[in-house]
Design a protein with these regions (language model features):
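Long, contiguous interaction/recruitment modules in multidomain scaffold/adaptor proteins
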Residues: 1-48
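Alpha-solenoid helical repeat scaffolds
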Residues: 48-51, 85, 122, 156
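Alpha-helical adaptor scaffolds
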Residues: 30-39, 43, 61, 66-73, ...
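TPR/TPR-like (Sel1-like) alpha-helical repeat modules
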Residues: 143, 148-166, 174-177
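Register position in tetratricopeptide repeats
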Residues: 73, 107-110, 144, 178-182
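TPR/TPR-like alpha-solenoid repeats
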Residues: 70, 104, 141, 161, ...
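Structural marker of alpha-solenoid helical repeat scaffolds
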Residues: 56, 90, 127-128, 161, ...
Length: 182
């Protein structure tokens, strides 16, 4: 038994137990804008703890959304895409789930994921063409896929929605010029 502790997977089990125990505190810090931001190791422990929780609470949309966000921050495309897919499947009308899933798909290295993400973004834009977050992601996705006319149309729609002094206007105007040159 003593040699198992040294050679077995006990250290991994202990790390998992610690991550699970720390999840509530890490989650509270992650959600508190006044708290010190989590470092990468803490984010990884939060992701492990969330995955563990979601094994027993698979219908928790907010938990899947948090795991998706954590996966994006950690650059773990598989975790992010899977978590957002679950959140979207559970609540397709949830705009955070839909937008998170679309973003994860459009950032994927798989062209089929990119296509599916673009389709989802087109549906989101047609559902609500006044959501700046959706329009922004749609425009950049269209630009990356060399659909420059669609990108320009989305950015022009954003310009109509943003107030005159908004700092984002200059970036959008530059993006429009760049797309028109292509």
């Amino acid at each position: 038994a003593g040699s198992y502790a040294l050679t077995g997977s006990y250290p991994q089990v202990r790390a998992w137990q610690q991550a699970t125990a720390q999840t509530p505190g890490l989650l509270a810090r992650a959600l508190d804008p006044q708290a010190q931001p989590l470092n990468e190791e803490e984010m990884a422990r939060l992701a492990l703890g969330l995955r563990t929780r979601l094994q027993n609470d698979a219908g928790n949309v907010e938990g899947w959304l948090m795991l998706g966000r954590t996966g994006m921050v950690l650059g773990n495309a598989g975790t992010a895409t899977g978590a957002y897919a679950n959140a979207y499947r559970l609540d397709p009308k949830n705009s955070d789930a839909a937008l998170g899933y679309a973003e994860a798909l459009t950032r994927s290295s798989d062209p089929e994921d990119n296509r599916r993400g673009g389709e989802l973004l087109r549906r989101l834009v047609s559902r609500d063409h006044t959501d700046i977050r959706v329009l922004s992601l749609y425009a950049f996705s269209a630009f990356e896929q060399q659909r420059f006319d669609e990108a320009v149309a989305a950015w022009e729609m954003m310009l109509k929605l943003l107030p005159a002094g908004d700092a984002r206007r200059a970036v959008i105007e530059r993006s429009i010029r760049l797309a028109q040159e292509k």
